């Protein structure tokens, strides 16, 4: 390989690592139940906050609350996956299976 190509590859690697680090530090929000439950997670899929509207804290609705929390977590994970695909896809040229 010629030196220009090697430098280009190294720059792309640095840019990818920076983009990945930025994604990991980003906060994503997922909601469910019309905003009754809000889940925040980092780009590396760590849940950092869960907010539950006090109007839904009825012990008789335990199953509904649990389902809504699961839906909010799934929503935020989907958003993280989509953003990761969008950001990192720029580096892989849209090749499937890399991120």
Where are these regions (language model features)?
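Short, residue-level hotspots on alpha-helical faces of the histone-fold
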Residues: 67, 71-75, 82
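Long amphipathic alpha-helical segments used for membrane anchoring, targeting, substrate engagement
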Residues: 1-29, 78-99
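A short interface-forming secondary-structure element
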Residues: 50-62
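Residue-level signature of catalytic and energy-coupling elements of molecular machines
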Residues: 9, 45, 69
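N-terminal intrinsically disordered, cationic/polar leader segments
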Residues: 28-35, 39-51
């Amino acid at each position: 390989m010629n030196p220009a190509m090697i430098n280009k590859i190294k720059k792309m690697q640095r840019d990818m690592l920076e983009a990945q680090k930025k994604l990991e530090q980003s906060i994503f929000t997922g909601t469910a139940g019309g905003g009754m439950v809000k889940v925040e997670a980092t780009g590396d899929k760590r849940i950092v906050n869960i907010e539950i509207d006090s109007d839904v804290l009825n012990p008789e609705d335990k199953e509904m609350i649990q389902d809504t929390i699961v839906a909010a977590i799934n929503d935020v994970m989907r958003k993280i996956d989509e953003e990761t695909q969008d950001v990192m896809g720029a580096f892989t040229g849209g090749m499937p299976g890399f991120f």
